[in-house]
Amino acid sequence: GICACRRRFCLNFEQFSGYCRVNGARYVRCCSRR
């Protein structure tokens, strides 16, 4: 799924951890699904 990372959008790979992959290189915090 897709979630908003503060002012950006990325693919949320880990919904439990709340982290997503950006540009396939860096990891940023994403909105976690409750």
Curated annotation (Swiss-Prot):
Annotated PROSITE patterns: DEFENSIN
Database matches in InterPro entries: Alpha-defensin_C, Beta/alpha-defensin_C
GO cellular component: extracellular region
Tissue: Lung, spleen, small intestine, pituitary gland, adrenal medulla and plasma.
Keywords: Antibiotic, Antimicrobial, Defensin, Disulfide bond, Secreted
Cysteines engaged in disulfide bonds, as pairs: 3-31, 5-20, 10-30
Cleavable signal peptide: none
GO annotation, biological process: defense response to bacterium
Major subcellular location class: secreted
Keyword Acetylation found: no
Compartments where located: Secreted
Pfam families: Defensin_1 (PF00323)
Family of this protein: Belongs to the alpha-defensin family.
Main function: Microbicidal activity and inhibits corticotropin (ACTH) stimulated corticosterone production.
UniProt name for this protein: Corticostatin-6
Origin species: Oryctolagus cuniculus
